[in-house]
Amino acid sequence: MKKQTFSILLLLLCAVAYGQRKHSKTSAFKSYKGLVMAGYQGWFNAPDDGAGRGWNHYLSHGRFEPGSTNIDVWPDVSEYKKTYKSPFKLADGSDAYLYSSYDASSVDTHFKWMQQYGVDGVFVQRFIGDVQRGHGRNHNDVVLGNALKSAQKYHRAISLMYDLSGMGAGGDSLVIKDWKHLIDSMKLTNRGDKQTWLYHRGKPLVAVWGIGFDDHRKYGLAEAERIIDFLKNDPVYGGCAVLVGVPTYWRDFGSDTEKDPHLLDVLKKADIIHPWFVGRFDEAKYSAFYERISFDIAWCKDNKLDYVPTVFPGFSWHNMNPRSPQNQIPRNRGHFYWKQITGAIKSGADMLYVAMFDEVDEGTAILKASKNPPVGLSHFVSYEDDIPNDYYLYLTGYAGKMLRKQVPFQEDVPPPVHK
């Protein structure tokens, strides 16, 4: 009888403890394993969208006009409900248009594409320096709220990725305050057991990107460790699984990684290790690079951690950084992207992170890109004539099927499906 009473009390205590946390017990997406998720910036604006941020992320040094822009890929906006006339012209002399991430219809279009092409979901990016007040916080909250609705509508997984870039010393308190704000105001992870927030290891997953980079950041491992501890252990807002975004050479303290050995102790507190590979190799150099993934995975297994590598379709940021060549890492009809996808799977990766869904700034976007970009003083990367504008959405969906063994593994890139 005493044993039975003790067991009942223990169950009640556990139930009370869980009830104090502000998360639903589960989700329609119970694990990152078997999924291909993309990063989602959602940071583009237009002067008339109501956000008060001008041509945010389209402009360069305060100007948006031919010869002055931050983007290298021009998005195809033919399927968007709302678009905005830009100062750029197409080859026939007509006006070129753009979309705003602030519009719910733009976010809805993106999630509809994810469903149509089989992209499993996204991590909505949240730069802590951009969400402290005013227009920045409002924009990011609106985009996240719209993404939550569209993720549910189209049954796509969704999570949040805090990007610590630009955070100052002691900025962990800002992350903690912001997480509480989102949990209380949006009920991010408390939308019922059929919600589409991504869970992992039985807990809602949150990502914290920018830990261990050796690029003169004002914050350090102490702030990162406090954020991880809070997200995992706080009695009310914690109880989360944590993905940490780290440098490429995190494991052996290479050129992009700070040399403090405590880094590995901090990373062991997380649940998933996610190294950033964008710009580290091109197609020719990937074969020599990708064995690193299998060594990373072995380390993670030894330390009871999961691992997700980055894959990206190409890279170009000439308009943002004119000294860099345009089309710096060519897509090569999808061969570069597919080489990384097959390399990661062969190395033992059981989940993938795509950089990025919508980042036209650095030419890594997988969304539909214009085959007829503006002409003039600014130059834009365009896909090859025989490659359709939706090819990278298609490849991303196919990668998910291959990762889950729903289709046979194939080294050769699947050919485009022309409509």
For the regions a language model picked out, list residue spans one by one:
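Bacterial Sec-dependent N-terminal signal peptides
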Residues: M1-K22
